[in-house]
UniProtKB/Swiss-Prot annotation:
One of its GO terms (molecular function) is serine-tRNA ligase activity. It catalyses: tRNA(Ser) + L-serine + ATP = L-seryl-tRNA(Ser) + AMP + diphosphate + H(+); tRNA(Sec) + L-serine + ATP = L-seryl-tRNA(Sec) + AMP + diphosphate + H(+). The keyword Membrane does not apply. It comes from Sphingopyxis alaskensis (strain DSM 13593 / LMG 18877 / RB2256) (Sphingomonas alaskensis). L-serine binds at residues 230-232, 284, 384. Belongs to the class-II aminoacyl-tRNA synthetase family. Type-1 seryl-tRNA synthetase subfamily. Consists of two distinct domains, a catalytic core and a N-terminal extension that is involved in tRNA binding. This is Serine--tRNA ligase. It comes from the Bacteria.
Length: 426
């Protein structure tokens, strides 16, 4: 959510930020609506002040025996009172319209975010690991993983496309991945493990910006609750409508949850395999910080995600997203892309973003500095640490063997109960 005061103070900078997002200038339109709202508010305040003044004058006129003046004042008070509901309704309507207009606009990119319209404008910052040299042609996971227990056909019979039914050691491996990630993020990166609701209300989905823009990407229950598309929704909203103590910051939270996405805008993309599912597991990393700490926190968070890939010995590259490719709420984003030999390509496995105070304004999440006056909005950050299903895919493709089996990465062996390799199910 944008601060209208910043738009008033520097409309040109606001329009420049929108332009970097590929949007037309809107400051003039927004400021005109803001001026209309303030005029309505001034009119209401003036009417209330005059009503109070006239009410006092009635008593004075009565005391002076001036009945005509008293009656005229009574009529004026009655007229002011009668007109007030319409004025207040006009104010509410204008306030709602301005709120909705601002809520529909994305966050503005940070100064160090590169310009660009789409993923072609993203900047590769670094690479880690050397892709494995195979002595056979590596396959995409969709071509060999079903024999190992990644069953798409059974899932399709009961749920349709973009679902999977995992069996035996394959299911154990996915569970091991989630537990391994949680252990790393809590023990080594200092995140507090949380178990969150999987269903949230409208105001929570609005706070983390899934609503209203991404309504079509969510699943909604018949009683109006929304299935979370990421536990960012529930973790970040843990501080909504709160005033935190400065000493309590930063807050770092993590959760391993199933996530649910309709993938309404992904028709025809990744229709094979386990890359893009309606239901998937993910470890989310959320941070709540002071404004001056959020840039460093983004680096720390991204490093925590990178450490998982390195522990699993999965080659990856780090990308700085351009302004046109960032998510709606982000002011700066790093993507981590893991190497998939079966696709001969790097694919996104984690996205780590600094949202500044954009979500905090929507949630009214603030903090008070020690010895300070007034409250400030916190900064919120989120990132995947990691997407479990995509990490499973990366292991399947990078650790596949010529006979169709898959070796278990050394880091996961303590979680696998003695299983060292996935082999075709009998």
């Amino acid at each position: 959510m944008h601060d209208i005061r910043l738009i008033r103070d520097n409309p040109h900078a606001f329009d420049a930020g929108l332009a970097r997002r590929g949007l037309a200038p809107l400051s003039a339109e927004i400021l005109a609506a803001d001026a209309e709202l303030r005029a309505l508010q001034t009119d209401i305040q003036a009417a209330l002040a005059r009503r109070n003044e006239a009410s006092k004058l009635i008593g004075q006129a009565m005391a002076a025996g001036d009945k005509d003046k008293a009656e005229a004042l009574k009529a004026e008070v009655a007229a002011l009172k009668a007109a007030l509901p319409a004025r207040e309704e006009a104010e509410r309507a204008q306030l709602a319209a301005l709120h909705d207009r601002l809520a529909a606009l994305p966050n503005l990119p940070a100064d160090d975010v590169p310009d660009g319209e789409d993923e072609a404008g993203n900047v590769e910052l670094s690479r880690w690991g050397t892709p494995r040299s195979f002595d056979f042609t590596p396959l995409e996971h969709a071509d060999f993983a079903p024999a190992l227990g990644l069953d798409f056909e059974t899932a399709a019979k009961m749920s349709g496309a973009r679902f999977a039914f995992l069996k035996g050691p394959m299911a154990r491996l996915e569970r091991a991945l989630g537990q391994f990630m949680l252990d790393r993020q809590t023990i080594e990166a200092g995140y507090t493990e949380c178990a969150t609701p999987l269903l949230v209300r409208d105001d929570a989905a609005f706070g983390t910006t899934q609503l209203p823009k991404f309504r079509e990407d969510l699943f909604q229950t018949t009683d109006g609750l929304w299935l979370i598309s990421t536990s960012e929704m529930s973790l970040t909203n843990a501080v909504r409508e709160q005033i935190l103590a400065e000493a309590d910051l930063p807050i770092r939270m993590t959760a391993l949850t199933p996530c649910f996405r309709s993938e309404a805008g992904s028709a025809g993309r990744d229709t094979r395999g386990y890359i893009r599912q309606h239901q998937f597991w993910k470890v989310e990393l959320v941070s709540i910080t002071r404004p001056e700490d959020s840039d460093a926190e983004l680096e720390r968070k991204t490093r925590a995600a990178e450490s998982i890939l390195e522990a699993l010995e999965l080659p990856y590259r780090k990308m700085l997203l351009c302004a046109g490719d960032m998510g709606f709420a982000a002011r700066k984003t790093y993507d981590l892309e893991v190497w998939l030999p079966g696709q001969n390509a790097y694919r996104e496995i984690s996205s780590c973003s600094n949202c500044g105070d954009f979500q905090a304004r929507r949630m009214n999440a603030r903090f008070r500095r020690e010895g300070g006056k007034g409250n400030e909005f916190v900064h919120t950050l989120n990132g995947s640490g990691l997407a479990v299903g995509r990490t499973l895919v990366a292991i399947l493709e990078n650790y596949q063997q010529a006979d169709g089996s898959v070796d278990i990465p050394a880091a996961l062996l303590p979680y696998m109960g003695g299983i060292t390799r996935l082999t075709p199910l009998g």
